[in-house]
């Protein structure tokens, strides 16, 4: 009996990881991620695009290699399920990298990358209720139409997010951030930050929040009435929207910061 239970548990863990193919150019995976859990996407060199899938469908991931030199098949993909039920998808550059619960880890040989000039475009469809977590280093991130939480971060690239509901957090270093928020219950904070680029957030007219907007080299502007609780200038606003509540932080170093009504 105990042996049967162990086999069943192993099957349940392995099931979401089984439906995958890779022909050396295109990687495909589809599997179930429970509502309320994250699909966690880790790329290094290339864009990540996430779209809303059909209701009740599985998560679908396509990794498309673009090869400008070397052997594209040496860029590998790995999938793992975390103990908390989240599913991790990693694009791995080089033989010494591995996929962990926290993403791609291990020694990264930059000389190998120069020899194997490969980028990977990740295209993902998520059903309602599945949360999206996306990371890249050299590539943009776009998320369109999803219904649950989004956490998106890159180093060199723009971040664009449009949701109908759920929290959003977005960061980049060299790129702009454009976010269209839907409804977001609870009082968890949201952050939108970049170093070199603009930050623009479109929000519902009934938005209530404790707001902090700032830039060093640029301007701040907004379409909402605000009750000032701190500094208000051409480069910084700190105040309360509506009845206040969740913290919303919008920051840039070199770029404008704007809070607008309506959508992208």
Segments the model singles out, each with a brief description of its role:
Residues 1-7:
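Bacterial N-terminal signal peptides that target proteins for export
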Residues 14-16:
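N-terminal signal peptide c-region/cleavage motif recognized by signal peptidases
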Residues 19-42, 47-135, 144, 151-153, ...:
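Acidic (Asp/Glu) and glycine-rich low-complexity loops/linkers
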Residues 139, 157, 175, 197, ...:
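Hydrophobic lipid-interacting interfaces of membrane-associated proteins
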């Amino acid at each position: 009996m105990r042996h049967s239970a162990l086999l069943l548990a192993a099957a349940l863990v392995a099931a979401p990881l089984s439906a995958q193919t890779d022909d050396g150019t295109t990687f495909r995976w589809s599997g179930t991620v429970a509502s309320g859990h994250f699909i966690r996407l880790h790329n290094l060199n290339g864009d990540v695009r996430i779209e809303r899938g059909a209701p009740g469908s599985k998560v679908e991931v396509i990794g498309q290699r673009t090869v400008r030199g070397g052997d594209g098949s040496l860029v590998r993909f790995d999938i793992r399920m975390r103990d908390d039920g989240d599913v991790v998808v990693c694009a791995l550059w080089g033989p010494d990298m591995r996929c962990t619960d926290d993403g791609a880890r291990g020694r990264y040989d930059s000389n190998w990358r120069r020899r194997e000039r490969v980028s990977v475009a990740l295209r993902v469809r998520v059903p309602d209720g599945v949360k999206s977590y996306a990371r890249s280093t050299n590539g943009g991130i776009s998320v369109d139409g999803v219904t649950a939480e989004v956490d998106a971060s890159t180093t060199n690239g723009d971040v664009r997010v449009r949701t109908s509901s759920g929290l959003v957090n977005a960061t980049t270093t060299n790129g702009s951030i454009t976010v269209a928020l839907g409804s977001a219950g609870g009082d968890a904070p949201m952050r939108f930050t970049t170093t070199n680029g603009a930050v623009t957030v479109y929000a519902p007219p009934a938005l209530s929040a404790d707001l902090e907007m700032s830039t060093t080299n640029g301007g701040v502007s907004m379409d909402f009435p605000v009750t000032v609780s701190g500094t208000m200038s051409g480069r910084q606003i700190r105040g309360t929207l509506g009845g206040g509540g969740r913290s919303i932080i919008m920051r840039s170093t070199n770029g404008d910061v704007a809070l607008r009504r309506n959508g992208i």
